[in-house]
């Protein structure tokens, strides 16, 4: 199936909205320190790149090359990635300790509260952008995307202590899909 310009634009729009929404859901639920403007722009660029890679002929070769470049970049920036991951983990565990007494705050570095979690959030959003672009451009089922997005959403909803009615609405909306 050859994708049209409209499906490419729809893919970029959906992937950008999904990745930005995912990142900001985590940021606002757990008060994660992150540079939000840079993160939003990077999510749009990632959505554009993932959609463009899936349009190319033999896209799996290009995706493999992109994964290898990404792995090299992560290895090169491993200290920054580790600090960003530690900041995210510290922010999430701090919110869970405040909400549920008896848990311990997890800290992987000396001062994780001073860091910026934008890098790890961007790395976490790449598979979601790729899956969303693949779903839109290839005409795949939406169930795979919903199954992938549900764990971070549940993680954020648990900390917000969502009332049971919201869970019922969420489950009923999933049944109709």
Regions found by a protein language model. Give the residues of each.
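Linear, non-domain "peripheral" regions
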Residues: 1-175
